[in-house]
Design a protein with these regions (language model features):
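Histidine- and acidic-residue-rich, metal-dependent catalytic cores
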Residues: 2-239
Length: 239
């Protein structure tokens, strides 16, 4: 029988990535924060779906492992590379407790494509578009004046982002002052509090997140990826 986790594995993941490359997890935390506050203002999703979407936002770039690709991802370029999305898709699909959302991770930078090699439902595509909106808001505000965000979002309204989602963001911003809290770093305390209050995972879910973390770290080196794969198979055989 599963028992609640003894450690907060989400916090472990955040701390681990912060030591490796703080740029990615800081970006993920801000994207997760934007989504978290927006989801407080809707009844479109169940509490479990809201938490799942927060986790997707937090870890949406978990497949990034090359410094050059991280640099590209964190620049404001709408011609995004899919390489990190493919690795993220494989990690979520094969190891994480959110495997049903793997296609969301795969298409979070390409949610307006005309053809999808991996089928994606409208429900998941809407989530991917929402994550991409939060992603672009964060990247834009890191590199530009917040005052210019409105013009940017209007420029892509209807072409990349749903007008209703943009309106949803601005209503949430007016109520919760998301951008100001991100700039002052106050958001970190809210994210940390949310993680500790909502990440009450069962033992099997914790194990899956730890496997996701392990393999994501080892994607950074072909040698370590092969080593970990061999070690996992050997451990399973011994067990």
């Amino acid at each position: 029988m599963n028992r609640p986790q003894l450690i907060n594995v989400v916090d472990v993941i955040c701390r681990s990535f912060r030591h490796l490359d703080p740029r990615l997890i800081s970006h993920g935390e801000r994207v997760g924060y934007i989504l978290m506050k927006m989801l407080e203002e809707t009844r479109r999703y169940t509490p479990q779906e809201k938490h799942d979407i927060f986790m997707l936002g937090l870890l949406h770039d978990i497949g990034a492992y090359k410094d050059s690709e991280i640099d590209t991802m964190l620049s404001f370029d709408t011609d995004d590379s899919m390489e990190h999305s493919v690795f993220g898709y494989l990690l979520f699909k094969n190891f994480s407790p959110l495997s049903q959302y793997a296609d969301v991770v795969l298409y979070h930078h390409n949610c307006n494509a005309q053809y999808y090699s991996v089928p994606i439902s409208n429900y998941h595509r809407d989530i991917a578009k929402l994550i991409y909106l939060a992603d672009r808001i964060d990247i834009f505000c890191v590199q530009n004046m917040e005052e210019d965000l409105y013009t940017f979002l209007e420029q892509y309204s209807g072409r990349i982002f749903y007008p209703a989602d943009i309106h949803w963001f601005w209503n949430t911003q007016e109520k919760h002052h998301i951008l100001e809290k991100m700039k002052s770093l106050e958001y970190r305390e809210e994210v940390s509090d949310y993680i500790f209050r909502h990440s009450n995972l069962m033992a099997d879910q914790t194990h899956k997140y730890l496997r996701t973390l392990t393999f994501s770290l080892d994607f950074r080196s072909e040698y370590t990826a092969l080593h970990t794969d061999y070690a996992v198979h050997l451990s399973n055989n011994i067990a």
